[in-house]
Amino acid sequence: MASEVSASQGVPKPKIDLSKKLSELRSNRKSQPALPSRPSREPAPVTPPLSNPPDLSSHQYARPVCRILSNHDHQLFLSSSSYSLILAFIFGLSDSVRGRATTDSKDRPVSPNVSKILAVVESIRTLLDQHPSIDQGGSRFGNPAFRDLFDDVAAQSAKWHREILGIQDSTAIEEASAYLIHSLGSRDRLDYGSGHELNFMMWLLCLRQMQLYSTADFEMIVFRVYVTYMHLMRDVQSAYYLEPAGSHGVWGLDDYHFLPFLFGAAQLVEHPYITPLAIHNNVILDEEGDRYIYLDQVRWVDSVKTVKGLRWHSPMLDDISGAKNWSKIESGMKKMFVKEVLGKLPIMQHFLFGSLIPAAPGMGEADDVQTDGHDHTHSHDHAHAQHTDHFGDCCGIKVPSTVAAGAEARKRGTGLRPIPFD
């Protein structure tokens, strides 16, 4: 007994009764007004109404030039009618293929003007064989022979617009041609990225503004025209090893394209058995890749990488595959298009404005020089001088083509060291 007393006397009593303090904290928390609940995740941007094409009876066409020269100009663009027009057009195309397979349009008639637009894209393909790549001894960087193709397309473009599309106004041809020519990639830097892909869509938008086709043709514009362009650019990238413009490397969605994932996710909304996780199933990719653009692009990306497995070479695609359904992915792709393409100054500072896609009042006036569609996006946002390219590439760092890595490995066997995660 004495020992128990002495032991208890030896233990110091706490100066503060923590049990009382804890009860006070609980009572205070109950008495405080409830904090407002966190808002739900940002909803996907809605598709704005697509305005009617302009009256062209007395229209003054203009050669497209860069007008986004500062953050202020970019903010003006983001609140402009042209921004709404671009969103309405791109999202309208995406909405037109929701729940539809690419092959659903296989036996459907194509309007004469859509056939003509498709013929222009096919005309570019015919030039590929005329400009073979130059042997660079296994180099994975851009092949200079691309410049010959670029120059040939620039020389032929006016003829195609006049003879195939039937556009006779030379200023209208000049305006539309600028977007088509610069949809191939950068002649100077030998690269290609989402800004060049956007140029192709703006060429299609110009033709819509010229009333060469209507919203009734949107599904065919995606399934016939865009898909043909996408496959054309794969051949261009494979032939000339175009470097990925503004690549985020392994942490990017894709080295070159964005829209296959937007259009492709829309196609798969409410699909009865293809889930987002199906992109890991090679059997489904092989069987369904020709029917759905998303699966086709994943199949292509995996085929050109030297390291196999999405989790290794495309962890962002791997992460997205964990989404509940395709509606979630479609919503996310729309948000990405707004934030990562139209919302990025390093991309949009090279966007071309003419009369059909006009600049907002108050935007900067660029020199009368045709720029070269530079569209690098960085984790360190910074603007580049509009006409200064001291290194021939952004920041002096060239990113090798991952398409080239696989191609050169196949050509030369195992003697070529693969780029990590390419």
Curated annotation (Swiss-Prot):
GO-annotated molecular function: peptidyl-prolyl cis-trans isomerase activity; protein tyrosine phosphatase activator activity
UniProt key word Chaperone: no
Statement: the UniProt record of this protein carries the keyword Cytoplasm: yes
Localization, UniProt: Cytoplasm
Residue ranges with Basic and acidic residues bias: 14-27
GO biological process: mitotic spindle organization
SUPFAM superfamilies from the UniProt entry: PTPA-like
GO cellular component terms given for this protein: cytoplasm; nucleus; protein phosphatase type 2A complex
Keywords: Cytoplasm, Isomerase, Rotamase
Region (Disordered): 1-57
Reaction(s) catalysed by this chain's protein: [protein]-peptidylproline (omega=180) = [protein]-peptidylproline (omega=0)
Matching InterPro entries: Phstyr_phstse_ac, PTPA_C_lid, PTPA_sf
Pfam assignment, any one: PTPA
Entry's EC annotation: 5.2.1.8
PANTHER family referenced in this protein's UniProt entry, alphabetically: SERINE/THREONINE-PROTEIN PHOSPHATASE 2A REGULATORY SUBUNIT B, SERINE_THREONINE-PROTEIN PHOSPHATASE 2A ACTIVATOR 2
Function: PPIases accelerate the folding of proteins. It catalyzes the cis-trans isomerization of proline imidic peptide bonds in oligopeptides. Acts as a regulatory subunit for PP2A-like phosphatases modulating their activity or substrate specificity, probably by inducing a conformational change in the catalytic subunit, a direct target of the PPIase. Can reactivate inactive phosphatase PP2A-phosphatase methylesterase complexes (PP2Ai) in presence of ATP and Mg(2+) by dissociating the inactive form from the complex.
Protein family per UniProt: Belongs to the PTPA-type PPIase family.
Name assigned to this protein: Serine/threonine-protein phosphatase 2A activator 2
Species in which this protein is naturally found: Aspergillus oryzae (strain ATCC 42149 / RIB 40) (Yellow koji mold)
